[in-house]
């Protein structure tokens, strides 16, 4: 499981980081075309918006993998280790179900609907950009399963004070 987590982390860091770098370059290009060349680039503005969504959702998957998602430590910090383990597994299950229903199922639905719609400046099917929703959902589910296995094996620190 640790190898899978490391591989996913590396891939997501490259994709999210690459999106950020490309967004920065394209935003600089927008400034140059708008203020220096006096001919604004519309396609780059649209692409930056889609890259931002990709970066945010892939970054959210990374956070899920690090168990950095929102929690309420007050509820578990005074519990016994066995109860803490149970609550952590429950939390991961809720996150996995949410990702499966909202991101995977809902993402597939919206992606298939958006395949017929084209972007205004790029001329690409909107579904191409929406595919990040089910992708992120699948990654979140995978990370949740890895987290549950590691919680049950005791390889994850359940100390909530960190």
What residues fall within each predicted segment?
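Alpha-helical transmembrane segments and membrane-interface helix-loop junctions
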Residues: 1-162
């Amino acid at each position: 499981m640790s190898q899978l987590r490391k591989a996913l982390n590396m891939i997501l860091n490259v994709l999210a980081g690459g999106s950020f770098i490309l967004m920065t370059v394209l935003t600089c290009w927008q400034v140059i075309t708008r203020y220096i060349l006096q001919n604004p680039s519309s396609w780059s503005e649209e692409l930056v918006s889609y890259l931002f969504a990709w970066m945010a959702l892939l970054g959210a998957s990374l956070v899920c993998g690090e168990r950095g998602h929102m929690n309420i430590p007050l509820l578990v910090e005074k519990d016994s280790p066995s109860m803490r383990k149970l609550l952590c597994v429950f939390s991961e299950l809720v996150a996995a179900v949410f990702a499966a229903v909202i991101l995977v199922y809902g993402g597939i639905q919206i992606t298939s609907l958006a395949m017929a719609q084209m972007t205004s400046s790029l001329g690409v099917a909107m579904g191409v950009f929406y595919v990040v929703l089910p992708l992120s959902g699948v990654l979140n589910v995978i990370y949740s399963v890895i987290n549950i296995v590691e919680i049950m094996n005791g390889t994850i620190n359940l100390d909530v004070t960190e």
